[in-house]
């Protein structure tokens, strides 16, 4: 009897997040008490092919000055912790034009919505089915949630 062993490569990938990063599961939103910011669950979730991500910048007690500017980035990562996309701001308020990538953008206190078309940045290729992380950074303070693409 002859046995044949197939050589295989198994990769276990863990998304590395700082200890103070909030990762929510089963909740509708995650909050950062330092900046008063909130990151909501994307909708729809799971999604195919596009999704929206609602978030709030500033809040009581950090938003006593409505003209205060916050440096904001929203990025999407695969489970290998590789950045694959930057959503765009959708329907922004009067001080910011919508459609701009949410990378080091200065925003005032308020409610915002980001849009992701489900495509990998720099390509016209749709992201594969699976679990992804999206991370909001407000003045360097991160909040992370997960989302699922289902084809």
Set out the residue ranges of the language-model regions.
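Short, compositionally biased serine/threonine- and acidic-rich segments at solvent-exposed termini, linkers
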Residues: 2-34
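Short loop/turn motifs at secondary-structure boundaries
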Residues: 25-151
């Amino acid at each position: 009897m002859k046995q044949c062993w197939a050589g295989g490569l198994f990769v276990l990938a863990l998304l590395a997040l700082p200890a103070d990063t909030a990762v929510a599961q089963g909740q509708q939103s995650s909050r950062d008490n330092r900046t008063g910011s909130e990151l909501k669950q994307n909708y729809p979730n799971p999604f195919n092919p596009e999704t929206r991500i609602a978030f709030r910048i500033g809040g009581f007690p950090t938003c006593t000055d409505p003209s205060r500017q916050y440096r904001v980035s929203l990025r999407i990562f695969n489970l290998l912790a590789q950045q694959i996309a930057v959503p765009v701001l959708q329907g922004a308020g009067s001080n910011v034009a919508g459609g701009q990538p949410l990378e080091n953008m200065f925003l005032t206190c308020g409610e915002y919505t980001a849009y992701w078309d489900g495509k990998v940045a720099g390509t016209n290729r749709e992201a594969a089915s699976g679990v992804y992380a999206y991370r909001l950074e407000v003045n360097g303070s991160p909040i992370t949630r997960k989302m699922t693409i289902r084809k």
